[in-house]
Amino acid sequence: NYCMDVNNDGWDDLIRFDQPGGICVWYENPKNKDGLWKGRLIMASAGIENPAFVDVDKDGRNDIICSDAAAKQVVWLKSPTGRNDTAWQRFVISHVKDLATDRYTHGLGWGDMNKDGFNDVIIKSGWWQSPVNVKEADWVFHPADLGKDCANMIVFDADEDGDADVISSSTHDYGIWWHEQSPGGDGNPRWHTHEISRLFSQSHGLIVADINDDGHPDLITGKRFRAHNDGDPGAADAAVLYWFEYIPGKTPQWKPHLIDDSSGIGLSFVVKDVNHDGRPDIIISNKKGVFFFEQAKK
């Protein structure tokens, strides 16, 4: 689920994804009137388990990156720009049918991989380089080994060596990792995966935010409660929620801090200063319930 003023009428609307490969719909805010919110179709077959909600074309409004599971394409959907406009425009990133087009594809990110000033689209097997005109089709793909099935993929120079690294977390197993980029002898980068933590499994959502106001980006994630009901490693473990304090350096570290042990996360969650006290809070909805974690004063 995501929230934005889709039709530019001054009221926030709700964007909802069904099961991977199912419909993506936005619900129009009725402006405090009674009754059900009117649903409008964005896409009939939206794939990838963690679609990205980011500003692709730098117009100040978030767009959607996902796959078209029926057409076997990776696409981005431009959000409406005019007042009372409801049309989403579809642009193809990749026509390669076997590359991140499965409805249950795990792993998607958005960030500048080659330091050219343009954000790229990242999957676990590589990344598509953003053209200057993001509406162009068939972005150039660069193969890379960015680990196992994961959720959100975060582009971040973790070891402060001037290039882009990638952080990811396991969706249905144990593991949170950072993938170190280093120069290769043939001019192509090499990737080496380092484990950050394996305290819990099923970390099916990952967010970066400065939790302790030290100027450094920390990691927030947790265990997705009943991700596959049973069957995943650690399925019966406690539904924990953690933040990992980033300690920068050539060998970066992330110090774990337990927030809660009876909530966990869902496919997505929100880190935001809800009560305007200058400290980020956390909002979660999953199969265990709906939770608001207010960050207390030290």
Give a label for each model feature.
Residues N1-K298:
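Beta-propeller-forming repeat regions
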